[in-house]
Structures are given as structure tokens and as C-alpha cells.
Amino acid sequence: MEGPYGNGFEKVEGKVALVGGGIGIAPLYMVGENIENCDAYLGFRERPILEEEFGKVTSNVYTTSGDTLITDILNVEKYDYILACGPTPMLKKLLEMTEGTKTRIQVSLENHMACGVGACLVCTCKTHSGNKKTCKDGPVFWGEDVIL
């Protein structure tokens, strides 16, 4: 077994929202442990879990499940930074929501990876500075650079 690959979220200061969907929620717990003054927004397909755990490491925890999307309850302009991990449609919506605001966003992509060393190109993603390998250059990218 090898890993983890690539890079993590860059350290930021200010008011931060951690936004996770599905399996993208788990990586945000450790991020919450290392950032002061952050809120967690967690979206679940079914019933919410981990609320109590996130409550120990964040200021506030907001959850949605079922037909309500986590992006439906998030006001991006309340935050200096958003750190997000989850399904591509959620990340794409967050990029749209932050466009034209002062809020900066980092997204952790959930692309499939095969070799883990950048040779196979399975995990390639598009950015404004050319194609990048999620396993080597990511999986975390600044929102203004990545194209979803």
C-alpha cells in the first residue's frame, strides 16, 4: 500500500468554512482540528453522521440530507475561505457560488487514480494553467485555477 499522494489544503487564516459531501467529509475532520475559527457544512445522502465529532473541532456544524443540498444553506460571503471536498457537482456549484466574491476556495478533487506517480495520466484534470495530475499536483487546487 502506498499513499497519501499529492498535496493537502494550504493553511489559511480568517473565517473558514469546511464544506464536505459524502466521502469527502472524512478528510475535513483533520483540517478542522488544525484551523481556528471554522464552521463545518456537511452534506449527506441519507442521515447525518459525525456531527458530534465535528462539533469538537469546529465552531458550528450545519448538515443536510436527502433532497436538500449543502450548497442550499451556505452563504459563501460570510467566509474568507472555503475548503471543500466532495463530489464534482458539489465542487462545481461552490466554484460558481464564490465567483465574483471576496471568498477564496480550495477544492480537493476525488478523481480516480491508478499509478499514483503521474505516469498513467488517469487522474488528469483541467486547470487554467494547463492539464494537471491530481495524484502529483493535487488533489487540492485553488478554485480560480481548476476547471470543473
Segments from the language model and where they lie:
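Short microdomains enriched in Cys/His and/or Lys/Arg
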Residues: 137-148
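Local cysteine-cluster metal-coordination motifs and their immediate loop/turn environment
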Residues: 27, 89, 110-139
